[in-house]
Amino acid sequence: MRFTLKKIFFVFLTLLIISIGYLLLQSVDLQRIRELLHDSEKFDLESLKQASLEIRKEIHYTNYLFSGYDNFTQQFSDEETLKQTSLNDKCKLVFTQWKESHPDFEFKTFEPEYERYDKSSDRKELFFKERINQLRKRFEKDSNNKNKQFTLSRQDNKTISQEYMEHVNRSKNVLQFMADFVSMMRLYGKCFFGRELDDELKSIYNEFRGKLFPFISSQAPKFRKSGETEEFGWPIYDNENNIIDRKTEFGDNPIEFLQKNSKGKGIVISVSTRYAKDAMRLIKILRALNNRLPIQIIYKNDITKKNIELLEFAAVATPEELFDPETIRDGAKFMPELNLLEHYKNYGSEFPIQDLTFVNIAGCVSRPYRFSFPGYSNKILAMLYSSFEEIILFDADVVPTVNPQEFFDSKYYKSSGTYFFQDRSLRDFNDFIETNFFSTLFPSNEKSIETIFDIPRVGEKTFNNKYMTGWRHYQEAGVVAYNKMQHFLGILMMFPLALWSEPVQSSIWGDKEMYWLGLSMAGDENYEFNKYAAASVGEKTTEQKYKYYPNSDSNEVCSTHPGHIDDNGRLLWINSGFSYCKKNGYFRDKGKFPFSTFELNDLVELYNSPIKIRAGLVPPDLPNQREPGSPPDTKPEMEFRKSWKSRKKDTDEINEKLPEGQEPYDFISEWGPQKGWVKNGICSGYYYCAYDKITSYSSEKEFDTGTLFEFDTKSCELYDYLSKIWHTGGSKMKPKVKLETEKLGTGSDKEQXKDATTVRLRI
């Protein structure tokens, strides 16, 4: 057979076309067929839940490894060589490597929504539900689909699944960055804090200060003593606690400056004009309790001149001036039988002049972050920028009922350099994704960069606390006693928590959990909480006709005020001032039980009077909702929450979804309380009733029990006295004064009082 050139050409062309067609089939049709053959993804609810479980296992904190771990360990031939290497050499290596491998490393806030950690990353079924609802709404909105039924195609499911995995991968990357960032902070503390540094380490120390803490500027706060006009810089002390210099700038490394130049003990209050009235009341309460600790008011150019004058007046005026009928006429109606001017000495009050300093930190935050610290986060700035080494941080609206020195003298503070207080044990729960997130920020894994650098790992104390075992509320931060130098890294750890928008902001309530979280993130578990959780303080309900569970033998204390009681049954402080209800007047609540049974005049008098503290009730603690260690399998906690539905309903639940025509329940006679804290609509929802005997969550016993504290007559008289002080303490009247400067010596904190000059204001 002869092959002509023409035939050869056609054969070649045919083979080429077949080859191209085959390749196209391979890349398109066969690829599509291959995809279909391998497309086994299921989208039923159980399959989605199983996929969620696999994701939770994948993102579990035990799988976290510092990004620089392998690069670092590869520089050592064996484990023994690594152990023999000095801390200085390890520090130089780890920071140099990190700089080389991450040249653009800097703090990130993750503020834009498209950058954020997605808390639905472990809930594929929830993600699908939300996206399907969006598709359905879009379908129904389209006028062309009026008579059509919404259906979800397999391709729709696949698109949602792909989008879900994009969110998961983004969240993984964000979590890795955040955990790496916190690891770098721990290494920074280990390598540089409290150590003698050579020039190379000093250079690294200063360089990474800017990378880790770019929000801290080099400008020092401006200090001004009460009654003076001159502002001065940060006080520098010698070894005998004499002030030898003032600094208006922190120098090359503000972190080093702040750590080395904080001295003395004192009270710190973050105040703006919004909270100035509460702060005036607090200062007068402190004087009634004979406080002799110096006070620093931390602000950011956000207190008016008038309010500054009123705060100064509260701090230095004589009792005659404080309780002058013209000054306190708004508060004179409260307990008229108690004449403060005649009786204050009967309560042991000396009303010492307060050593008050205003600390303006407006310039201390770098310009790009000036508006990144609103509200509660100002308290974290106040901790850092107070010049005290040991602080009691007060919210402006708290009321201490003991001399503040007692917080420093407590066994908890003496043993740990901290004294924290527990919140109410409300039955509000958190989710796996939240506790697992925070666990990833803790040093907890054996295979870790922290182990190599001998940084302590956290254990049962952290993982077994109330928050980490599934409950939303653990710490109440109205009062925090804190030794800054002993726990300096813990303060710094709070800043990324305050600046990262998600998942932090939706996982904790303001700053409340940040104090113990910051310490655990630092690998520092040397912190202590008060023995008892928060109590409901007020009057025990004694008349059956006013009780929400009239046939129960559980004690009941209803109040808008949580209080905090020490091991010996003494009330230490309360939240939210002394008003019976500061959110609204009686008018909104007059139709709500038990006030619906009151005579109107009696209700008006109740709302216009301070709360009477006669008892404090601490409800029983809750069992773990989640086992320690954030187990990826959430079925046990879901089953536990499901079991609540089989319990009888409390007054905050029983009126939900009532059958049409059925009268709502004011109270429940047939059974007793099921929860220790039952929320009420009174006072805009700030009113809670506490119970010390509830149906047990355990099948092994009938009841869980708490503790009722009934205060003695002397204590109750003191609380009434303090309530009168508080109600007369927030006058907005601008006093007519002349200034007389005099030397102030408190006698208790020598280092704070040596150069202290104050003023006495005369009406």
Swiss-Prot record:
Induction: Induced during biofilm formation and Up-regulated in response to treatment with MUC7 12-mer, a cationic antimicrobial peptide derived from the N-terminal region of human low-molecular-weight salivary mucin. Its EC number is 2.4.1.-. It is a single-pass type II membrane protein. One of its GO terms (biological process) is mannan biosynthetic process. One of its GO terms (cellular component) is Golgi membrane. The keyword tRNA processing does not apply. Residues 1-7 are cytoplasmic. Residues 649-659 have a biased composition (Basic and acidic residues). Glycans are attached at residues 71, 157, 169. Residues 617-659 are annotated as: Disordered. Residues 29-763 are lumenal. InterPro entries: Alpha_mannosyltransferase, Nucleotide-diphossugar_trans. Keywords: Glycoprotein, Glycosyltransferase, Golgi apparatus, Membrane, Signal-anchor, Transferase, Transmembrane, Transmembrane helix. The chain crosses the membrane at residues 8-28. One of its GO terms (molecular function) is alpha-1,3-mannosyltransferase activity. Pathway: Protein modification; protein glycosylation. It is found in: Golgi apparatus membrane. The keyword Hydrolase does not apply. Responsible for addition of the terminal mannose residues to the outer chain of core N-linked polysaccharides and to O-linked mannotriose. Implicated in late Golgi modifications. Belongs to the MNN1/MNT family. This is Putative alpha-1,3-mannosyltransferase MNN15.
